[in-house]
Amino acid sequence: PLHWFALDQTRPLFFFAGICTPWRGTRGSARTPRAGDHQLFAFLTCAPNSVVGRIHPKAMPVILTSAAEIDTWLGADWSEARHLQRPLEDDELIEVE
């Protein structure tokens, strides 16, 4: 089943900490390889809070909720940005239908 999460019932916008990079090579399965230029994407993860942990006990994406966090993620050195790698507090995230 699908599970949806929000910061609260008004469902304000939030962001995942992620990276993307261009890459040239062969991707796909051995049966259907695709050579050429690709965009690779990844999300930074952390230990789950108890809201997400009930559904996915291994990890959750790092969620950015403020302009300051977004600016840090996009522009700071890793020595500063790595401090964003933490779960939201349990009361900062809800499961919604």
Q: Residue spans of the language-model regions?
A:
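A structured binding-face within diverse protein domains that lines the active/interaction site
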Residues: P1-E97
